[in-house]
């Protein structure tokens, strides 16, 4: 057996646990971090970004393992291809990997104490989601946990590259609240599994159509308003307004779980695009198709994907 075979297997397992969440973690964190790279020497830029990747990897892996270890019954219904329900990894194997991911994540913060607030915030958020009943309620699951988790992600992503600024902090807070307001979209596609495990998500509490009306006519306008408070919406008002309108239209369509999954993915692309606009402004660049394409190319994302 090749010495690289165990490494390849672990990478494959990591991908199996985490790939669904890259567009809300590793990719947006990397995009936002680009905005902090202005005037940095190339060697410093590369070193700091590699450190960020080192932090982001256990950030997402620790969460995915925690979520999927405690959510096997739900995954058997909603996502049977995941490593545990598919039999690719045993529950005990996932638990061993959880210990490694958690130890690595916390160890990085102890080595670089300036990341301790974001690290502890994320650990507390994951515990809240996976170990308490409040993490199964629509308000706790999205309004609270998505807000705090996004803050940890974006704050650390910027700080890994350069010190935070008042502007970057305003962006982080605004985008975090934006995410907490409209991530209920993810629950429109998973109602069967959520009902089976006793979750109280927005669609299960207010009904399918009721939740869609709340998201479209309350959460989306409120989210746009929050972005405007930090000056983000003003960076590309026509584009962001149109994208949120399209998102609202898709939410109201009731096209079934597969359609709702695509709507959720569309939401994650808007998330990445918002951070790309912030990054371009942080670099002092004019926002246009060419500058956006160049920025996204540094993170492996194309305009077609967005």
From Swiss-Prot:
The reactions it catalyses are: (2E,6E,10E)-geranylgeranyl diphosphate = (-)-cyatha-3,12-diene + diphosphate
Glycosylation, residue list = 64
Its keywords, alphabetically, are: Glycoprotein, Lyase, Membrane, Transferase, Transmembrane, Transmembrane helix
GO molecular function term, any single one: lyase activity
The metabolic or biological pathway listed in the UniProt record of this protein is: Secondary metabolite biosynthesis
Cellular component annotations (GO), alphabetically ordered: membrane
- Which family does the record claim for this protein? Belongs to the UbiA prenyltransferase family.
Q: What is the protein's name according to its record?
A: Diterpene cyclase eriG
Organism listed in the record: Hericium erinaceus (Lion's mane mushroom)
């Amino acid at each position: 057996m090749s010495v690289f075979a165990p490494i390849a297997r672990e990478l494959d397992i990591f991908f199996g646990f985490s790939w669904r969440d890259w567009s809300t973690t590793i990719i947006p964190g990397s995009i936002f971090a680009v905005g902090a790279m202005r005037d940095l020497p190339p060697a410093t830029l590369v070193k700091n970004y590699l450190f960020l990747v080192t932090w982001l990897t256990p950030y997402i892996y620790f969460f995915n393992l925690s979520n999927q270890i405690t959510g096997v019954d739900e995954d058997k219904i909603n996502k049977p291809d995941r490593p545990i329900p598919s039999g690719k990894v045993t529950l005990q194997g996932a638990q061993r990997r959880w210990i490694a991911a958690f130890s690595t994540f916390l160890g990085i913060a102890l080595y670089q104490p300036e990341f301790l607030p974001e690290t502890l915030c994320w650990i507390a958020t994951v515990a809240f989601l996976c170990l308490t009943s409040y993490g199964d309620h629509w308000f706790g699951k999205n309004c609270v946990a998505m807000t705090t988790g996004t803050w940890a992600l974006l704050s650390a992503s910027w700080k890994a590259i350069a010190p935070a600024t008042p502007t970057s902090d305003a962006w982080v807070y605004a985008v975090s609240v934006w995410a907490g307001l409209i991530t209920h979209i993810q629950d429109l596609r998973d109602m069967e599994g959520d009902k089976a495990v006793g979750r109280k998500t927005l669609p299960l509490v207010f009904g399918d159509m009721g939740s869609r009306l709340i998201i479209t006519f309350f959460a989306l306008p409120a989210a746009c308003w929050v972005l405007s408070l930090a000056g983000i919406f003003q960076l590309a008002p026509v584009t962001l307004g149109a994208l949120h309108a399209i998102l609202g239209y898709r939410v109201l369509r009731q096209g079934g779980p597969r359609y709702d999954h695509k709507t959720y993915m569309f939401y994650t692309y808007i998330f990445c695009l918002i951070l790309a606009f912030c990054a371009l402004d942080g670099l002092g660049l004019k926002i246009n198709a060419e500058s956006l394409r160049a920025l996204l190319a540094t993170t492996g994302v194309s305009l077609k994907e967005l």
